[in-house]
């Protein structure tokens, strides 16, 4: 549990597009009194901290610093965005060997100065790297969280909301499994303000069939690739997703978010990190929820877990 104190310190490891934008989103949210940026490119980190600090007049009081791992000491949350960026045509899982080696140098340094922090992994492939962080840190699973499928779930809500012309916040659903190509949409539990999606579509004379589900799912699954093809990287939406997770932790909200967590016995899945609805609060992940999936969804989730396990088993440097 994060201890109540007058200051809240968040460190962001990696000051690339995702890290810098995350720091910006955290600054706007007003959740932290201190934000520390750490990156191997110290000049860029200094520049990002300066640029952010120059906006201090427009937000709640917050101290933005650039520094090294020693400066992260006693952070409440350490957000890890460092790693090789995903290139055009490259899958998240193809990043693994590059980023495992990077994490082997980062995590021991983070742990050295932050014995009680919650670690929030954002770097891709996030599920695999969350597991790597869990193993390297020696922290309990509750305090090693991956950003998981929080963003993917938002993308799914956006797609449904756009097609049905409703506020996406009124769509209740989850993307589960890998944050990547094997992720699954949980159509069987999807509802619009507690009305099952098929019933809602029928009442409102809206499309809901195999073609609808396929199109929506493909758009969600391929969303990052489409953004990368157009602008080179994704960073705004993931920064907002990270900020949402951070707020849930710092506010001890006990809110349900599909973060990446260590799964130990769910449809036979165990010893792998993947996106699942979890109660997120001051202790980190307080409980993973075992929601009932239909047979098709459960089978796909098992395959998603197998994909992640195979990637870990085939990765070099572990």
UniProtKB/Swiss-Prot annotation:
InterPro entries: L-lactate/malate_DH (IPR001557), L-lactate_DH (IPR011304), L-lactate_DH_AS (IPR018177), Lactate/malate_DH_C (IPR022383), Lactate/malate_DH_N (IPR001236), Lactate_DH/Glyco_Ohase_4_C (IPR015955), NAD(P)-bd_dom_sf (IPR036291). It catalyses: (S)-lactate + NAD(+) = pyruvate + NADH + H(+). Its EC number is 1.1.1.27. CDD domains: LDH_2. It is found in: Cytoplasm. One of its GO terms (cellular component) is cytoplasm. Substrate binds at residues 86, 92, 124-127, 152-155, 234. Keywords: Cytoplasm, NAD, Oxidoreductase, Phosphoprotein. The active site is at 179 (proton acceptor). One of its GO terms (molecular function) is L-lactate dehydrogenase activity. NAD(+) binds at residues 18, 39, 44, 69, 83-84, 105, 122-124, 147. The modification Phosphotyrosine is found at residue 225. It holds the Pfam family Ldh_1_N. Pathway: Fermentation; pyruvate fermentation to lactate; (S)-lactate from pyruvate: step 1/1. One of its GO terms (biological process) is glycolytic process. Belongs to the LDH/MDH superfamily. LDH family. NCBIfam families: L-LDH-NAD (TIGR01771), PRK00066.1 (NF000824), PRK06223.1 (NF004863). Homotetramer. HAMAP family: Lactate_dehydrog. Catalyzes the conversion of lactate to pyruvate. This is L-lactate dehydrogenase. The lineage of its organism: Bacteria, Bacillati, Bacillota, Clostridia, Eubacteriales.
């Amino acid at each position: 549990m994060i201890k109540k104190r007058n200051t809240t310190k968040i460190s962001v490891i990696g000051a690339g597009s995702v890290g810098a934008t995350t720091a910006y989103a955290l600054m706007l949210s007003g959740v932290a009194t201190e934000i520390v940026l750490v990156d191997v490119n110290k000049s860029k980190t200094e520049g990002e901290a300066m640029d952010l600090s120059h906006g201090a007049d427009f937000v709640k009081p917050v101290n933005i610093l650039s520094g090294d791992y020693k400066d992260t000491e006693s952070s409440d949350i350490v957000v890890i965005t460092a790693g090789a960026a995903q290139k055009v045509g490259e899958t998240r899982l193809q990043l693994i060997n590059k980023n495992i080696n990077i994490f082997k140098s980062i995590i021991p340094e983070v742990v050295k100065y932050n014995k009680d922090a919650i670690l929030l992994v954002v770097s891709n492939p996030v599920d695999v790297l969350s597991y790597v962080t869990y193993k390297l840190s020696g922290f309990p699973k509750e305090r090693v969280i991956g950003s998981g499928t929080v963003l993917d779930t938002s993308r799914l809500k956006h797609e449904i909301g756009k097609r049905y012309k409703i506020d996406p916040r009124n769509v209740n659903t989850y993307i589960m499994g890998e944050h990547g190509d094997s992720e699954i949409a949980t159509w069987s539990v999807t509802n619009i303000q507690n009305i099952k999606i098929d019933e809602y579509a029928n009442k409102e004379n809206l499309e809901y069939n195999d073609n609808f589900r396929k199109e929506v799912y493909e758009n969600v699954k391929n969303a990052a690739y489409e953004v990368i093809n157009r602008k080179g990287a994704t960073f705004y939406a993931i920064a907002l997703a990270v900020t949402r997770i951070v707020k849930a932790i710092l506010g001890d909200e006990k809110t349900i978010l599909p973060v990446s967590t260590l799964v130990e016995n769910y449809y036979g899945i165990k010893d792998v990190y993947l996106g699942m609805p979890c109660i997120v609060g001051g202790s980190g992940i307080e409980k993973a929820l075992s929601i009932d999936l239909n047979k098709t969804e459960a089978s796909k989730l098992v395959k998603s877990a197998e994909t992640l396990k195979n990637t870990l088993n085939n990765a070099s440097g572990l």
